């Protein structure tokens, strides 16, 4: 079975809480605060495993959670950092945010890894909050919260050459002839419902991987049939071999088939459409009118496709020359990473300092991830904490922005469920 998509839930570890503690030793008066910091929460990290070839494991386990950080303690003891959780994925895995469908990472090399959920920062102990005017702070920061999200994993085949074409044109037969792959072969449409891979060995030439991409039909670029799933597998190939049934035994016109498949490629991705393409006019052993091939070749060449081979996968006629041309083309094309456009790329929000302010009547509402983190870190009922809270708002520019918006004495400022009256 070839599983090429999976959806999993990942959750990093929460940061450990800072400690509120004071030094208590005989003969040492006013020992001062000695609460240690909390440990950092563990990250969730996706790591490429070159030995994995499918996403099948993720059908059995779908939720992954890293260790939280340990809490701080007295005597300035710091909490233990939580262990990172490493999740192995196959090479060629695309990571997407499940909510936005934006691409987060392209794990295409053996050494690639990606932190998909960052552990929360450990909270500061009260020994961190001493100042010349605050010698005995009796508050500490709780650990920062964990990150959690659903992500989608897509495995895109790392094949060098992709066999494309309508169903039942002989792609699977060709793959079985040029490699040791044994795909299912039968005389009906959509025999191949999953991509098959094979390795082609040519004496004196580097081996290359060839993939039989399941049949693409009209409307594939719009999701008709299994179209989008099939087209996804073609993206990483460097050379395409477009297999055409030149015999027309099913009543289809070879040139019309050629145009339709290329139109679907173009609609899906112009870059995919522009990829080097070799035309393989297959089933020539069943062709009784040689002029039909020459006519087809002339029409195709007008579109700029000058590599047209007459082959028969069943009798192996012309197959060796076809594979040698594919190898020659590959030697001229560098392996490149999948290009990700800015609109498709997932932008990691800088969560710590993100906020917005809006006004409703005489109430100014401050909201955002910065607010959530700040309120999580302080006890607004404690005078020391409250002074620290106002200092942070001032340092981060919140107070200045409120004044620029025209806030006046007595106006209410609301941060989540906490409100206070503004005073100049």
From Swiss-Prot:
One of its GO terms (cellular component) is cytoplasm. Its EC number is 3.6.5.-. GTP binds at residues 165-172, 190-194, 212-215, 282-285, 312-314. InterPro entries: G_OBG, GTP-bd, GTP-bd_Obg/CgtA, GTP-bd_prot_GTP1/OBG_C_sf, GTP1-OBG_CS, GTP1_OBG_dom, GTP1_OBG_dom_sf, OBG_GTPase. GO terms for molecular function: GTP binding; GTPase activity; magnesium ion binding. Its main location: cytoplasm. PROSITE patterns: G_OBG, GTP1_OBG, OBG, OCT. Residues 159-331 form the OBG-type G domain. Monomer. Belongs to the TRAFAC class OBG-HflX-like GTPase superfamily. OBG GTPase family. This is GTPase Obg. It comes from Clostridium botulinum (strain Hall / ATCC 3502 / NCTC 13319 / Type A). The gene is obg.
């Amino acid at each position: 079975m070839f599983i090429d998509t999976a959806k999993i839930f990942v959750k990093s570890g929460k940061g450990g809480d800072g400690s509120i503690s004071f030094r208590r030793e005989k003969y040492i008066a006013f020992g001062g605060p000695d609460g240690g910091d909390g440990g950092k929460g563990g990250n969730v990290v996706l790591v490429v495993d070159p030995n994995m070839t499918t996403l099948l494991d993720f059908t059995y386990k779908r939720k992954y959670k890293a260790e939280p950080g340990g809490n701080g303690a007295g005597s300035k003891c710091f909490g233990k950092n939580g262990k990172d959780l490493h999740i192995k994925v196959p090479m060629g895995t695309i990571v997407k945010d499940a909510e936005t469908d934006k691409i987060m990472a392209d794990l295409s090399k053996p050494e690639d890894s990606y932190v998909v959920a960052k552990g929360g920062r450990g909270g500061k102990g009260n020994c961190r909050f001493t100042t010349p005017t605050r010698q005995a702070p009796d508050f500490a920061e709780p650990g920062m919260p964990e990150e959690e999200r659903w992500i989608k994993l897509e495995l895109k085949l790392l094949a060098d050459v992709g066999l494309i074409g309508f169903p039942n044109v002989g792609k699977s037969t060709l793959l079985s002839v040029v490699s040791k792959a044994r795909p299912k072969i039968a005389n009906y449409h959509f025999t191949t419902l999953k991509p098959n891979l094979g390795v082609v060995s040519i004496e004196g030439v580097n081996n290359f991987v060839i993939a039989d991409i399941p049949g693409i039909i009209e409307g594939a670029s719009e999701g008709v049939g299994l179209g989008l799933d099939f087209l996804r597998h073609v993206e990483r190939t460097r050379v395409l071999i477009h297999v055409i049934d030149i015999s027309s035994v099913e009543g289809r016109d070879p040139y019309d088939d050629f145009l339709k498949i290329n139109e679907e490629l173009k609609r899906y991705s112009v870059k995919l459409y522009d990829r080097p393409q070799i035309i393989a006019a297959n089933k020539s052993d069943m062709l009784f009118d040689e002029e039909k091939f020459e006519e087809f070749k002339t029409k195709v060449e007008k579109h700029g496709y000058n590599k047209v081979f007459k082959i028969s996968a069943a009798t192996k006629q012309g197959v060796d020359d076809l594979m040698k041309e594919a190898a020659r083309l590959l030697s001229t094309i560098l392996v490149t990473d999948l290009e990700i456009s800015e609109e498709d790329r997932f932008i990691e929000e800088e969560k710590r300092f993100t906020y917005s302010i809006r006004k409703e009547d005489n109430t100014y509402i401050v909201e955002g991830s910065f607010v959530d983190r700040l309120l999580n870190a302080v006890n607004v009922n404690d005078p020391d904490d409250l002074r620290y809270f106002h200092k942070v708002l001032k340092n981060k520019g919140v107070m200045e922005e409120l004044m620029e918006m025209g806030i006046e004495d007595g106006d209410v400022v609301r941060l989540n469920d906490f409100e206070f009256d503004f005073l100049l």
